[in-house]
Amino acid sequence: MKIGLVINPQSGVGGSVALKGSDGAELQELAKRRDGEPKGSKRAHAFLERLLLIIDDLTIELSWKTWGDEMGETVLRSQQVDFEVLGHPKSPTAGADTSEACSVISGAGVDILIFVG
């Protein structure tokens, strides 16, 4: 099974400091100044831990495709699974990075695309 993974590394950073969302560089910077904590990577890590336990019991072979750095690569590397990075985000990440990642990974023939935000 071919699985695509895209993580919004900035998700949750605004909500944790009483901002409504985290879209845009200005809101992300304000959230960081208020010690906002992004939640996307933590959510993805928790999801993958559970998924990999289930998959391991079923002996299903997985092929992962993801985007670079915090948009998938870092979390998959921490889980010690084989994966392919199909591109890299700009820094800081923006909505355009998510759109590009989803488009490229979907076009790579994955069976399912998992988005964590």
Regions found by a protein language model. Give the residues of each.
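ATP/NTP phosphate-donor binding region
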Residues: M1-I112
